[in-house]
């Protein structure tokens, strides 16, 4: 775990986002020590409208906040990624977070990502170049008022598959070269828009298997949907 943290730090990242469930507490200990900004995540696209689910969700939410509220690296509370929570329940959970962590009223923001209502902020995801879109417009898209922070960007690849250099192809072969070309373009264009955007989160540091898989039938996705990673590029 420590080696993973060191690799992330050595790669030049200055912020970390859980993907998409709570990680081991040693991660936040390291982020505290190294001054890395931490966007902690509680859940991902899950909802069952039963009293038992609601109560257990809030019980686990309280534990999550209690374990992390005194960590100086935490700057964002991520209630749910691609949220399916009803607005009223998300508001109830946000109020619970603010009750347990008064800094969430004035300093720390409560979020969903790529969908959701009832929190302070639904952070966008911009996967241009991966799921369609025009990657050459990335800097202009990030500069829009509703973008500000990109919660996810990334690229598909097939390990050890290489292609000849050339212009970027949106529907090209998922080679390592194409992945590098896309990632380099997005990093460069985000830097050009740095006065209009506060950051972007590359998805994802690691996953269980070859990241060249295709959804929805890749590997153990169906039985492993609750984590510790949800499979995306």
Regions of interest found by a model, annotated:
Residues 5-7, 15-232:
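Substrate-binding/catalytic cleft of secreted carbohydrate-active enzymes
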Residues 1-2:
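Short, small-residue-biased leader/transition segments that mark boundaries at the very start
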């Amino acid at each position: 775990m420590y080696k993973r943290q060191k690799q992330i730090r050595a790669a030049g990242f200055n912020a970390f986002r859980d993907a998409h469930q709570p990680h081991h507490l040693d991660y936040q200990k390291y982020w505290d020590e190294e001054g890395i900004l931490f966007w902690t995540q509680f859940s991902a696209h899950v909802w069952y409208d039963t009293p038992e689910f609601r109560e257990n969700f809030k019980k686990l939410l309280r534990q999550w906040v209690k374990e992390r509220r005194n960590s100086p690296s935490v700057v964002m509370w991520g209630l749910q990624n691609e949220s399916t929570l009803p607005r009223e329940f998300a508001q109830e959970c946000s109020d619970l977070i603010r009750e347990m962590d008064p800094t969430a009223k004035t300093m720390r923001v409560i979020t969903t990502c790529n969908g959701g209502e009832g929190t302070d902020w639904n952070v966008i995801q911009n996967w241009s170049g991966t799921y369609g879109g025009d990657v050459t417009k990335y800097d202009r898209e990030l500069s829009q008022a509703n973008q500000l922070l990109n919660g996810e960007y990334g690229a598909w690849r097939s390990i050890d598959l290489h292609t000849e250099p050339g212009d970027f192809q949106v529907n090209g072969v998922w080679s390592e070269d194409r992945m590098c070309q896309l990632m380099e373009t997005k990093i460069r264009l985000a830097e050009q828009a740095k006065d209009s955007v506060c950051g972007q989160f590359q998805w994802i540091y690691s996953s269980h298997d070859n990241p060249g898989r295709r959804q929805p039938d890749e590997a153990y996705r169906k039985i492993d949907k609750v984590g510790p990673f949800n499979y995306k590029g």
